[in-house]
Amino acid sequence: YMIDEAKKRGLDDTFAREAIYKYGEDIGKEMYNDMKDPTDMVEFSKHFGTGHHTDIYEMETVASDEEKLYIDFHYCPYVAEWIKQGRNPEEMATLCEIAMEGDRAIGETFDAFKFTLGKTIAQGHDVCQIRFDKKK
């Protein structure tokens, strides 16, 4: 609803993107500082996508090695709520892009990794594909 209220006041969604990005930066910096080697993808995999998030998002690690960390989310509580709110597919795709600013920021904290968002549940797919690849 925050985006809806902002639109009523003549604001675009930039404020939300920036705020969520900053939140992701904070998380990324904390992860970075907790790691012995922030260029080590295996160590990164022990920090990203762990804890209670694995259950909430029904996360499945589909690939994890020195070169990549690929995680599929099989559930998104945001999309579930947006559906209840009656959001159309275009709105959900935009809201998802905004919400993913946090993960983008986490990825950009690590110079050695490239973050990619693949398919998303908000786009109508059955998974959200979170991908981190080691830069060559």
Stretches found by the model and what they are:
Residues 1-97, 113-136:
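N-terminal accessory segment detector
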